[in-house]
Amino acid sequence: MHFNPPLEPATLIKRYKRFLTDIQLPDGSERTIHCANTGAMTGCATPGNTVWYSTSDNAKRKYPNSWEISETDKGHRICVNTARANQLAVEAIENGTIVELLGYNALRTEVKYGSENSRIDILLEDNEKPPCYIEVKSVTLLDEQVSTKQQISTKQQASTEGQGFFPDAVTTRGQKHLRELTEMVESGSRAVLLFTVLHSGIEKVSAAHHIDAKYSLLLKQAQDAGVEVLCYKAELSSTQIQLKQAVEFINS
């Protein structure tokens, strides 16, 4: 995914009303931009940090600029625009980056499925194999102070370095998606939970049991039923974002 024109830097003043963010431009002027993220954004929205924003050519938009990337005081970059995760996933499937999802001849998005009235993010189809239902989640929570159960049991040293978690807040919607992915597997289809790691400091991913214990339990049950979990990390810059490499999922 390329940004044209390239993203521009500013300083974060505050985020408010869920969708709005005030920033200070390099010339000292202030501007309100759109924030396409209604989540907790833990560690992603610290006032004073650098933000990178895009500019839309849609003249009808009230706020033509969108917050795309945060840059922390440690130099980590985080894509905070939640709409990008699905776009990046589609791009990575189509260009062959996600090798586990090769071999299908059709890709559709936002297809109705399941018994709880959901839409699957990506549906892969092929005449020679069962359909593959893919739910995409964006991972931006880096918490190096929390150990997973697996890390504690194996007494790994410095094992929390680069530890990312999902979700960053209780997600009943995410819980529903896990139930429906499990339902798809039980009906004979393939189901995949794809974590797009959009934080440059995250090197591995776990379910955030300390934040949403029910989600963590449902994810374990989904895996036991046959739902696959894939994690792919993005490279982020002011000119492009691309999913580049697989990272480990640690089942806590």
UniProtKB/Swiss-Prot annotation:
Family: Belongs to the SfsA family.
Organism: Vibrio atlanticus (strain LGP32)
Gene3D superfamilies, per database record: 2.40.50.580, 3.40.1350.60
Protein name: Sugar fermentation stimulation protein homolog
GO molecular function, a single term: DNA binding
Lineage of the species this protein comes from: Bacteria, Pseudomonadati, Pseudomonadota, Gammaproteobacteria, Vibrionales
A Pfam family: SfsA
InterPro entries for this protein: SfsA, SfsA_C, SfsA_N
